[in-house]
Amino acid sequence: LTELTLPNSVKSIGESAFAYCSGLTELTLSNSVTSIGYSAFRGCSGLTELTLPNSVKSIGESAFCGCSGLEKITVESGNSRYDSRDNCNSIIDKKTNTLIAGCKNSVIPNSVARIDGLAFCGCSGLTELTLPNSVKSIGRYAFQGCTGLTELTLPNCVRVVEACAFAYCSGLTELTLPNSVTRIGNHAFDSCSGITKLTLPNSVKSIGRYAFQGCTGLTELTLPNSVKSIGDGAFAYCSGLTELTLPNSVKSIGDGAFAYCSDLSKITSLAEIPPMCGFKVFNGVNKTNCELIVPEGSVAAYTRAEDWNKFSNIRGFSK
């Protein structure tokens, strides 16, 4: 299938109706279409242009996810539900100011309050993106698989980085989160293998499960003194990590949080009371060669604590 023109008799396009029709290069939607279902055109990577007729009132989640070839998105004037204001090359829900679908040439207007889940999912051609300060939330999988994205700065209003929001963005090299972020969701930056520098603000209280799993480019990691919990597998398979500093604020570390960080040679824990460890937190770490440095008066406590006591070389430092 390379071309698709829908007749005026078609009013709705069902779930996954044309999903993964990667050979589709031209699409003409008639002015009779009122709804486009979930994943209707997902993975139609050959599409370069999309014009949404003014008749469309409903678009399902991930309707255009993975349309990596899209260069231009236009919503016809007169559409009561959606627009592509300011030539933004995106589809925006007028009522909520939510951007629900974008492409590699999208420019996000200052009026957008939310980037919806899956809005840019699989948009591998996206290389630059400026998020305006109007954006307060970013949905799940919003930028998953945007492998061409190299830099990311989140606006100061974003409080939560939701699950898988930037997973598999392997081109990202540096990540700085604003002081507004309090929680990093599960798999949020999973397999962002290009990240070499990670700066987390003092506002972050929890790091979700597998949040930075497979970030193999990370070599050093210092967590801020606000983090209380580290989720299961949060930094698992960060095989390039050599030094780790855990703050005094950490109370619990989930199962396998640092599993298979095989190059770890130095861990500094600033907590006087050893954080509670889940199952095999440091599995795959050479506990004979990796040095564990803890507060001077806490060496005995660490030698007794579960998982910490598996390290052969525990020594104290003076504050």
Pin down the residues of each PLM region.
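Structural signature of tandem-repeat unit edges
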Residues: 1-12, 22-35, 45-58, 68-90, ...
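Consensus positions within tandem repeat domains that build extended binding/scaffold surfaces
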Residues: 14-17, 37-42, 60-63, 116-121, ...
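Generic short alpha-helical hydrophobic face used as a protein-protein interaction/packing hotspot
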Residues: 95, 119, 306-308
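Short, aromatic/basic amphipathic alpha-helical patches
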Residues: 280-283, 300-311
